[in-house]
């Protein structure tokens, strides 16, 4: 989880990475302890629940858990990705058979597996609850961890065969896992495959740009506080540095608030080329005062300049990722007015493209 707090030396807003995973609320622990295991081609292929004695399809096993304080359970599953490895997701949906529009949610960098999905479902799902109440199926997604500069250095994924087996020019990246998830949810019987949306925050917001630049299977997307430095081919300034222990870039303290500064440090021709292939309507959400607000805005500006279907909204809030409302220290959801407005705006955006 990433939050903003004042830097004690400079007084500026800087990002603090909270590395400890929030504990499940007591109520959530109780329901997880009694989670129903659903054997599960049935759960994914159709709406019929079979008994444990039924034939098990190992590629379609789903575990259903209650969500604390909610009437909508989560169906935990694994999706096969390009190279045959599996990535975890958590699906929730309204009552009934659908077909429903569906929105996939992504937050920040990848990794941490099913534990992350379960924790986010129990502790960061107020926003998703509002979507389900508005008639959407929702998915918390996980994907591979970011690979430093792989998107910039190795180009698009190319698939071939060698000795009858799959051959790739590079390993799949996190946004390609997301495309696999998108294609998977389109096969679910309660999902309308023509009404699939995506909402990504921070690195997940950049993934919205990467996905739609190469893939035209989304009806609409939201890029919330998109950390687009790689997509825009931005060269960091001296506010970023190299981590001496890993040799990798540390950009957590990078300051890119001004659009003029950002434009002067990106590869404009390359960024415009990547933007040119986007066909998906995109809402870009900024956050006033964020140290990367210039990056957020330039992503939108380039969409607008290229004549794309794009919208911009910016909000006054202290927390990076404010649109994904988390439980407070007391274990309850208590969204403020700005968070509620951001979520309402997000639902309204998807409604325009994904509701009849």
Identify the role of each PLM range.
Residues 205-216:
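Short glycine-enriched nucleophile-adjacent loop
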Residues 71, 218-274:
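Mobile cap/lid helix-loop segments that gate and shape the active-site cleft of serine hydrolases
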